[in-house]
Amino acid sequence: RDWSSDVCSSDLLISEADACEPFRSLINPDDDCFANPADMEKAITEYCRATGQSVPEKRGQVVRCIFESLALRYRQVLENLRSLSPRPIETLHVIGGGSRNDLLNQFTANAIGIPVVAGPSEATAIGNVMIQAMAAGEATDVAGMRQLINRSIPLKTYQPQDTEAWDAAYKIGR
């Protein structure tokens, strides 16, 4: 089904996803079948069918499948980064438009087991302004730019919840 003709907001999609059963079906977001399908919902249902999972029947189930799968993939990537980093990773920062998706950010915190700090949503524009501020002498280094941003723009922090359920889903999905 093509959702482009549906008139609905992202808030409605997120609300529908939040109301659905957790971990009903999961996908590998990096699978080649999701690179550029003509119909993403069809690609997801075919993937679930091929992997012996429950097939999403409602729009909210499809959205929840996507969000949960992304959050679990972020965990896998974070584990890889931790194995390469000499420093501990204790917080994940989400910037840009995705920082406005409360459900995905909460799922991400749940899946990775550390706080997620979301914002700013207009990171590209703010970065441009910060470079201009540095050129004008208003900020002298990256630390100064971060302090200025933190004083000027509200950020939202998501604490991990239900981590045992997310750990179990991660083990099944691996």
Where are the model-predicted features located?
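Active-site core segments that coordinate phosphate-bearing ligands/cofactors
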Residues: S5-L92, R100-T124, M130-R174
